[in-house]
């Protein structure tokens, strides 16, 4: 969702992973720090039919953004949005308001929102609104990676019936790589009725 896109073997980290894994890439730089690009990254097996980048910046806080990608899979229009919300409650509320039009759009049959919400309270404003728009999101503990007690990272799926399983991956390597555990969500789109 958020990546420091430094050079790796003659290309950006994003492109390196996309090439190594045979994936398609959608990326958005939100800001630069010490000459490095920072931003959002979405890698996918399927080729998106459309991608868009959305500015979720708030006041003088660290710039934030979202990647939106539309796919056609098994005859369904699928929208995937990946983002990373800010640290303050006010910032997260504003970012949610900026993102809502893309989540409330009923053109896609299916919607998936993957995010580090920086929000651990299940009854927070952000999660209450998202439950109303997309339905419930299973909570898996992802932060801090060394002793995960908070569910900062979530995957919302609408309809939820397409979500087969969801888990946080907790290995020694993962814990060294990030302060958050990655979330793996498995979807079954073939069984969804139009």
Which stretches of residues belong to each language-model region?
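A short beta-strand-loop structural module common to alpha/beta enzyme folds
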Residues: 1-3
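Active-site regions of metal-assisted phosphoester/phosphodiester hydrolases
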Residues: 7-9, 15, 19-194
């Amino acid at each position: 969702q958020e990546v420091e896109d430094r050079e790796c073997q003659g290309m950006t980290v994003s492109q390196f992973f996309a090439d190594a894994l045979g994936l398609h890439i959608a990326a958005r730089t939100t800001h630069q720090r010490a000459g490095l690009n920072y931003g959002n990254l979405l890698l996918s097996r399927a080729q998106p039919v459309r991608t868009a980048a959305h500015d979720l910046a708030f006041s003088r806080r660290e710039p934030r953004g979202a990647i939106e990608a539309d796919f056609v899979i098994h005859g369904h229009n699928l929208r995937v949005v990946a983002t990373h919300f800010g640290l303050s409650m006010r910032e997260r509320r504003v970012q949610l308001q900026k993102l809502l039009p893309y989540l409330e759009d009923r053109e896609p049959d299916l919607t998936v929102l993957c995010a580090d919400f920086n929000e651990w309270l299940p009854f927070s404003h952000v999660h209450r609104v998202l439950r109303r728009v997309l339905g419930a999101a299973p909570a898996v503990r992802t932060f801090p990676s060394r002793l995960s007690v908070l569910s900062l990272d979530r995957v919302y799926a609408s309809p939820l019936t397409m979500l087969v399983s969801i888990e946080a991956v907790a290995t020694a390597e993962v814990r060294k790589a990030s302060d958050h555990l990655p979330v793996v969500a498995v979807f079954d789109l073939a069984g969804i009725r139009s």
